[in-house]
């Protein structure tokens, strides 16, 4: 698949995300892998529902630098980390949904465990509601290098799939292509909403 076609799919996903209100106030960032050395990442400060192909910057996966000199997203280091940690990841979506942001603060543990929901099967490799989907939860940090280091250390100790939550911040998820990343995002967001409602009802 050509870079332009991949970027077109990513722009479509960004507009879909924007229409759902999942990246408010220019928040969030999205990318695709170009090859082993570079990715295309959304430029900082842009409304995600209005992005065009020209709003994506080529970024060096090893150095986090944009050869063009333009400013990539604040969380560039998280995207490049995912591409280094997960060779199968070719698209990354980082969003600020209400469910992900609030649920990440309700979970006091380092992992969110979800089970019993049919929609777990929206995640690649999940075949039954009887399994448990584990989503790591990391404390937010404005020092992205330090945060990336913590995530990398966790991944060495406890390999994980699909995505992770940043406490009080949002969800980062990925897939083998834009379509899979988008499906993982929609599936996880649905599961987070179910988990939120279940926790609310259990308190009544």
Swiss-Prot record:
Pfam families: Aldolase_II. Binds 1 zinc ion per subunit. One of its GO terms (molecular function) is zinc ion binding. Zn(2+) binds at residues 94, 96. Pathway: Amino-acid biosynthesis; L-methionine biosynthesis via salvage pathway; L-methionine from S-methyl-5-thio-alpha-D-ribose 1-phosphate: step 2/6. Its EC number is 4.2.1.109. This is Methylthioribulose-1-phosphate dehydratase. It comes from Enterobacter sp. (strain 638). The gene is mtnB.
